[in-house]
């Protein structure tokens, strides 16, 4: 295995760990409309844009497990959703799309929206009363607040990917 790839994967892992600690530290990120952002969602989506399918799947599963530990839901739910989502985002970017900020925003809007809607549907809708109130007052603000961090995380991961990729591979 190439050393650049090992260092890049370690950097992504460290990034996920730091973002997990930032999102779980009470009072560090102020809540907006009672919602706190999930920084791992944009991180794994943007990592998937710069990696091939299998590493994207792996980082989606790792980020999802961190979310499962922090968001207190069914263990494995976010790992499954984010793993599959990152696999398909990586495949789409490799085959049909270019990796740029517009694509990152589009995939982030759709991917994070899909993840939040699945989270609401499977973890809230059948278990509690007033699901529409919960969606509009908790899940929708969390979705919008999380989207604010997408450009910052995209440029961080683009810089990591370009700096830690071999020269002949980065020209492709």
Predicted regions and their residues:
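Terminal, non-globular segments
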Residues: 1-172
């Amino acid at each position: 295995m190439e050393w650049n790839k090992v260092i890049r994967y370690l950097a992504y892992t460290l990034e996920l760990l730091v973002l997990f600690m930032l999102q779980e530290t009470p009072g560090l990120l102020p809540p907006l409309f009672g919602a706190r952002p999930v920084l791992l969602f944009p991180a794994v989506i943007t990592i998937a844009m710069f990696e091939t399918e299998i590493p994207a799947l792996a980082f989606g599963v790792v980020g999802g497990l961190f979310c499962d530990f922090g968001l207190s839901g069914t263990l494995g739910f976010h790992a499954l959703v984010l793993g599959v989502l990152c696999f398909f985002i990586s495949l789409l970017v490799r085959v049909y799309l270019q990796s740029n900020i517009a694509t990152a925003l589009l995939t982030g809007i759709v991917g994070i929206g899909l993840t939040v809607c699945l989270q609401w549907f499977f973890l809230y809708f059948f278990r509690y009363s007033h699901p529409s109130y919960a969606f509009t007052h908790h899940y929708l603000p969390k979705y919008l607040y999380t989207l604010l961090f997408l450009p910052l995380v995209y440029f961080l991961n683009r810089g990591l990917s370009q700096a830690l990729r071999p020269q002949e591979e980065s020209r492709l």
